[in-house]
Structures are given as structure tokens and as C-alpha cells.
């Protein structure tokens, strides 16, 4: 059979029946049920690490309403024959996802939650017609289905539905909740900008999950997924036999994401072993517990691209699946001295940091340690060493893909913190031909922003372009002019003036003067000013950079 890629597949049965490649993670079923005493299990992983597909697989395996023998045929779990006889398709399963329960107001989010509960009720509509079900429960069930239930009944809804399922099937219910923390994550974000509904949303979820998880005689066990663990005191109050597994824990560490061996098998099946090193450079590097893993979303997207174009280049598939709010928070907090740490990370170094996986959303921004913890839990950073344990660990950027997010996002965010008065001072000096003042101001700006890539020339070019943008000028970067490409061209049409800048990176501080001269000579020799007709004043500058120092020279 030809190799088929499933990108973003979350329906396990469809994935298997369509013949698309599946990285076998079914052994988690046995380990979870037979090798733990957990009544409630929480797995926290970054977005796009296969949590939803995992939960859908569990639903297909356990659900009493399915016959799943065909779709599990040949998978690892079938080696445990006694386990499969005891558990496969033997339990009612209540599976709900909160992935889309997010809005800008409590009312909007609550409405979405009602809709998700209504969808679940429609999936189980047959329960409403069962005479074995308590009449009062049927009444609430109908109100849930038509989104007219009282808030108190919404908070009790999961337990009510589970009680109805138990009445019909005579078996305890397996509860699966995917992306449990999305509603409160969004609520916390909106509360931070003056729309406070975090406490209201938390109260609803605490009631909804608390009644389902605490002292519920109809619960066989529950599995929950999310990005962050919310402290037990905050939402899992009173839950017995509760265990959570984050990116710091060794147990279950290889079940989310692709291991190196799994990627090797995958590339062999795809006949693309030639891309192993490139995929490793771009998408590997995450350390979960004691396992090194790749991001499955990225690997499958890239393999899909390679099927369409044999020489497709790897790119950033992850950046549009996760917002950068936590990075913005870091940069805006002037009381956090993080610029130096970001520079170390972006230059492929490591930082030592105290981290915790036991957080509450309303206190995420209360300390620098918490924010580094969030970057770790959400996949922006990873442990530097799989053998490290404890709360103090070395952190690094996992791979080239995430490094590109830092370069695109963090550097720009720090640039945005440069106030307009500093930009204006720089422009005044340049328009006035004040080389000394321009050198000083540009050097000062360099000290305020992030440097990376060992101060490559591209870094300085991007720095200048970023500073000039937003000042009301037309900014052209590396556009063809004359016989070559000037680094920066500014046009001030209102005042009929223009500026050409050529930037050089100096290898030594004592080379800066001659590098400035070389930059000015390049402007002249390559006729960068040709074509700038109608401007009454054209300034031409060579700027040499050495680390965080700038030297400016004007063409006389």
C-alpha cells in the first residue's frame, strides 16, 4: 500500500480505515489501566502533540457502542489479549472537548459550553427515551440538549449524563475530557484586558468537573488533557487518586510526540530517509521526562509537503497554532530582567531556571519563574538534559522551528519597546548629518534590544529596518537600485528627501572606521542613488557594527 499521510487527523477510526500512517501509541491503554491506580489522570502537553487523537483512540477502544476489533488489528495493544477481552468495547464512554470553548466574554464562553454539552446529549439522545433513566434526569437532559438548563444543572451535567449511562448499560463510565483548560486560559487573557470573567468561568468548570470527578459512584476512571496543570486546589479540589503527568515527568513521557525510533520507521515507510537530519534539526529536540521527542504536527506536515514536492523545504508549521501572548507578557514586564536570558537562548545557549508544573492561570504572571515555567509547558522551551530532575533545570530552545519563532517574535517585541523619542533622536541626527550623535543613539538602541545569531549582518539589517518602520517614512529593504541592492532606502516624500544606508558587520572594533568607508564607497560605486529623481536632499551613510556598538559615516 502506498504511504499516506494524515495531517491533523483527530478521528482514530477514520485514520485507520483510510489506510493513513499511524504511529502506534496504543500501549498507553495498558499502562494507564493496569500499571497505575489512578482514578483521574491529567496529561499536559503543548499544542499539536497528539492529545486529541490519543483521546479519540481511547474512546474507540473502550466504547461499548463500538466494535473496534478491525481498527485495532495489528496494533501493540492487541498483544495483551486478556486486557483486550476485559476492556475493549466494554464501557460507556463520555467524551467531551473544550477546545473551542473560548470567547471574549463570560456569556459568550458559557454559550459555547452549553453548545458542547448539547452536542454530547444529541450523541446520546437515546438515553432520553430509556425508561430505566430517572425522570428528573431525563428532564435536565432535555434542557441540556436544547440549551435551556439552569447554570446549577450545567455544573452537574456530566455527572447527570454519566448516571443515565450507568442506568442503561449497568457499567461505570469512562470520562474523557480534552483540552480542559482552554475556557479558563481564554477567560484569564480577557480578564487581563479589563473584561473580568475568569472567576466566573473557573466556578463553572470547577462545578462541572468537580461533580464528575469527586465521589462519583458512576465513574470508572477519567482521563483529561490540556496544556497546563491548574493547581489541584484550584479546579481538582477533592479529587481522590489524582495523578498528573507534565513534560517534566518520566512516566508516559514517550506517548505524546514521536520518538526517534518512531520517526526512523516513519521515514522508512515514506521512503524519505534522506530527510532525517533536516527533520531532526527543525522538529526534534523536545525533552519530555526522559524521552526525546519530535512534534508530530510538524513532521506529518513536512512529509505531506514532500509528497507534493520532492525537494520541499522545511518551514514553521507550529507558529500559527499557538498564540504568543506569554512572550509579549515577558517583554512588557519591565520588572523582569529577561533580555539577557533571551539572548543566551537565541544564541543556542542554556539558562538555569526554577520551574513548576503546579500553577494557576490567575497567578501565571505573578513571577518570572512562573513565566519561564509556562514557556516550558507550552513548548517554547525544553529541558536541556533528560537526566535533570527537580525544580531547577537548564532550559534551551528545542529546535530550529522554535528558534525562528523567537527570532520573528521576541526580537520584534523588544524592538516595539523602543520609545518613539529615541527613534526620533536617531532620525534627527541622521537627517542633520550628525555622525557622532547618530553613532551614540544607534548604539544605545542596540543595548536595549535582543541580539542573536552571533551578530550576523542580517541581524543588524533587520534591526535597522525594524527601527525605521512606523516613523512615517517609506522604507525599502534590499530593493534593486542602480547596479546593486542598498540595505536600507528611506523616502520622506513630504519633505522631498531620501536616505540610503549600507550596513557592515565588523570583525573587530578597530575595523569599524574602514568598514564604514567601505560601505560609503559601495553606495558610490554601485550608484545606489541613481533613480532617486526629484528629491532635494539625499543622505548616504555607511554604518559599521561590532557587537552592540555602531559607527556612522556620511558620504561627503
Where in the sequence are the language-model features?
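Structural signature of nuclease core domains in nucleic-acid processing machines
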Residues: 435-556
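Phosphate-binding site recognition
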Residues: 1-456, 471-472
Amino acid at each position: 500500500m502506498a504511504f499516506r499521510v494524515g495531517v491533523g487527523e483527530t478521528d482514530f477510526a477514520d485514520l485507520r480505515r483510510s489506510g493513513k500512517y499511524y504511529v502506534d501509541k496504543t500501549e498507553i491503554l495498558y499502562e494507564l489501566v493496569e500499571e497505575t491506580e489512578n482514578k483521574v489522570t491529567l496529561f499536559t502537553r503543548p499544542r499539536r502533540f497528539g492529545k486529541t487523537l490519543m483521546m479519540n483512540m481511547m474512546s474507540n477502544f473502550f466504547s461499548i457502542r463500538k466494535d473496534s476489533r478491525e481498527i485495532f488489528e495489528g496494533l501493540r495493544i492487541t498483544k495483551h489479549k486478556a486486557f483486550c477481552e476485559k476492556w475493549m468495547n466494554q464501557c460507556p464512554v463520555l467524551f467531551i472537548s473544550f477546545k473551542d470553548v473560548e470567547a471574549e466574554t463570560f456569556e459568550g464562553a458559557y454559550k459555547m459550553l452549553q453548545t458542547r454539552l448539547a452536542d454530547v446529549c444529541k450523541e446520546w439522545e437515546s438515553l432520553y427515551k430509556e425508561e430505566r433513566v430517572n425522570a428528573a434526569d431525563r428532564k435536565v437532559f432535555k434542557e441540556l440538549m436544547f440549551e435551556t438548563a439552569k447554570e446549577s444543572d450545567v455544573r452537574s451535567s456530566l455527572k447527570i449524563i454519566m448516571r443515565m449511562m450507568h442506568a442503561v448499560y449497568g457499567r461505570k463510565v469512562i470520562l474523557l475530557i480534552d483540552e480542559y483548560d482552554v475556557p479558563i486560559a481564554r477567560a484569564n487573557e480577557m480578564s487581563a484586558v479589563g473584561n473580568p470573567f475568569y472567576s466566573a468561568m473557573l466556578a463553572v468548570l470547577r462545578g462541572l468537573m468537580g461533580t464528575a470527578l469527586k465521589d462519583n459512584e458512576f465513574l470508572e476512571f477519567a482521563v483529561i488533557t490540556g496544556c497546563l496543570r491548574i493547581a489541584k486546589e484550584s479546579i481538582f479540589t477533592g479529587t481522590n487518586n489524582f495523578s498528573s503527568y507534565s513534560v517534566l515527568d518520566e512516566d508516559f513521557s514517550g506517548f505524546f510526540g514521536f520518538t526517534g525510533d518512531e520517526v526512523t520507521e516513519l521515514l522508512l515507510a515514506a521512503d524519505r530517509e534522506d530527510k532525517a537530519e533536516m527533520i531532526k534539526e527543525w522538529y526534534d529536540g523536545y525533552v519530555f521526562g526522559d524521552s526525546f521527542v519530535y512534534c508530530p504536527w510538524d513532521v506529518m506536515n513536512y512529509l505531506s509537503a514532500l509528497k507534493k514536492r520532492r525537494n520541499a523545504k522545511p518551514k514553521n508549521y507550529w507558529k500559527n497554532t499557538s498564540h504568543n501572548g506569554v512572550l509579549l507578557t515577558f517583554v512588557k514586564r519591565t520588572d523582569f530582567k529577561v533580555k539577557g536570558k533571551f539572548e543566551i537562548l537565541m544564541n543556542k545557549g542554556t539558562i538555569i531556571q526554577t520551574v513548576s508544573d503546579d500553577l494557576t492561570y490567575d497567578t501565571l504572571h505573578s513571577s518570572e519563574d512562573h513565566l519561564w515555567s509556562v514557556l516550558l509547558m507550552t513548548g517554547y522551551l525544553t529541558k536541556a538534559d533528560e537526566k535533570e530532575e527537580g525544580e531547577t533545570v537548564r532550559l534551551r530552545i528545542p529546535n530550529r522551528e522554535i528558534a525562528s519563532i523567537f527570532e520573528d517574535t521576541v526580537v520584534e517585541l523588544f524592538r516595539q519597546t523602543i520609545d518613539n523619542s529615541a527613534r526620533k533622536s536617531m532620525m534627527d541626527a541622521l537627517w542633520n548629518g550628525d555622525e557622532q550623535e547618530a553613532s551614540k543613539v544607534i548604539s544605545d538602541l542596540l543595548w536595549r534590544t535582543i541580539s542573536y545569531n552571533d551578530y550576523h549582518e542580517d541581524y543588524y539589517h533587520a534591526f535597522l529596518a525594524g527601527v525605521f518602520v512606523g516613523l512615517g517614512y517609506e522604507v525599502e529593504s534590499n530593493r534593486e537600485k542602480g547596479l546593486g541592492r542598498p540595505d536600507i532606502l528611506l523616502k520622506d516624500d513630504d519633505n522631498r528627501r531620501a536616505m540610503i544606508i549600507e550596513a557592515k558587520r565588523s570583525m573587530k572594533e578597530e575595523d569599524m572606521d574602514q568598514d564604514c568607508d567601505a560601505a560609503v564607497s559601495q553606495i558610490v560605486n554601485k550608484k545606489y542613488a541613481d533613480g532617486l529623481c526629484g528629491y532635494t536632499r539625499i543622505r548616504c551613510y555607511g554604518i559599521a557594527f561590532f557587537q552592540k556598538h555602531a559607527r556612522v559615516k556620511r558620504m561627503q
